Amino acid sequence: MEVIHAQATSNGGTYTNEQRSNLRKLIEHRKMVLSQVKLISSESQSETEPSTFPVQPSRPAPKLSSVSKHSLKRRAPPVPSSSSEETSAAYSEPLTCTDCSSAMTSESQKEIVIPPNFITELLEKLRINSGISYTTSFVVAETIINHIKTKIPSIANPMDTLLSEITNEKECGVHSNESLILTHDGQCIEKAFLALTEHKDDAQQRSWALHMDEPEILDQLKELLTLLVDANQKVSKAVLQQNDFEYLQSTVIYFQMEHRASIRLQLLQLFGCLCGIDKEVITQLLCSVLPGELARTMQDMPQDLQLQLYSSLVLTMIFSTAEPLPHWLYDQLDKKFVIYLISCIENAPDGEDGDQLIDSFVGLLLAFNQHFSDLKKNLVMNVLATCKTTKNVSEKVMLLINREEDPVVLFDYPRNCSNSVLKFLLDVFASKDTSGLFFTSDMMVLLEILLRQITDLNPGNQLRTQYLSLLRLVFTNTDYFEHKHLFSEIELCLKRIEKEDEAESAHDCQVVRKIFTQFHTHFS
């Protein structure tokens, strides 16, 4: 407004039509702002009578030309009237607008209220409208809000609140199962499972015409798999846990009824994904017909490598937590099944396919062996005792123990077995019938590994105790004292442990004393 007045002043005090129009618009805006300020002021302060005169400017009016001096006789603005209101109002604008803007900004920050579940809804909107995963939506939301906070400092406080809520949602967001199921992802996942249930129901009446539904089923399975991978795992859990895992049990029955290889492979991928969502899924599958069905499928279709690998992986997942198996399951997972696994490992073809088969089946063998606490009833050890040699099994197990890898650790769930590879070796060397499966060269490598681990591990570490126990079994059930590989180094290590007086070393010292007592003729 001052610019318009300055232009008019330089033009002899004459306003053009365009300038007058712009002034009217600006004055209307000023009236609106003033009314808002009065409303805010009336809520926080006692009421006062409005001034009849406009606020005087805080600085002198612009210097007028000689023409304007002659026409305006005085410098102070006149009492507002219909003819002079625009000029006086315009002169007072700079101070009034600044004050009012400051008041509005301060008040608007106080009045910003973030609605409940705002962050949850924002993350879901990002998922729906962009197709990104639930995890990625956190990154996107944080990036946007941080950018707004940086570029618009006046709203930094509410942006900080939003960032804090995002962190809380990521780390400890708590929602009822009902609210999770009602989310967009929850509804989509439930819809996909309902479609699978319909296919399962139709499978009992399948005819040649229904085989045309294969592309549709595959698309639905792929869509469901994508949803489960991208969605919030809490949402997936909530949907799965409904009615005692009804959707999961229905999918297992559908797998049992479905014989098309392409659909079976897709279902196996689905089971693998579900195992990673909730530990309870593994418990449910362990007590279902799925393990027996997978064991039967593997033995009936040995030429289908892809089906073998997927079935083996899902079985390894189901056995990974070492939960007790239902007794009736041993009718299908019997000696015949273990013999099949070992035979496939030892007769695996050369090349990449053979390597994949060995890796997968050895992992399954280790996972299955976790479930046996009684050595006499251990199906895996009973079958190995009848084998003359297990070269591939031995080499793979030695590689795993040397690398300190456990192929059975697939999830972060609690497990009943700390290390499947170490447990397998403890079982093998617990009997002379199985300890002879390892060649002398393998034994020497194993002794080097045991010495390294026992030396490096700290007192109180459960693994050190297990390695010491394994060393004692090697001394007991092999011909170690015929070659005495690394004997002096092992003796020094054992004597050092025997002298440890920490409470954490008590169990280890007990094992060492048993070794010295049992083999006193060899140790000085």
Regions found by a protein language model. Give the residues of each.
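Alpha-solenoid helical repeat scaffolds
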Residues: 219, 266, 293, 310, ...
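Amphipathic alpha-helical interface segments within eukaryotic helical scaffold
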Residues: 346-350, 356-453
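Extended alpha-helical scaffolding segments
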Residues: 298, 307, 439, 444-515
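Elongated alpha-helical scaffolds that mediate protein-protein interactions in large eukaryotic proteins
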Residues: 12, 133-138, 148-340, 350-359, ...
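Structural signature of alpha-helical solenoid repeat scaffolds
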Residues: 225, 272-273, 316-317, 366, ...
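Long, well-ordered core segments of solenoidal/helical folds
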Residues: 248, 294, 298, 341, ...
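Intrinsically disordered, low-complexity regulatory regions
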Residues: 1-200, 469, 478, 490-524
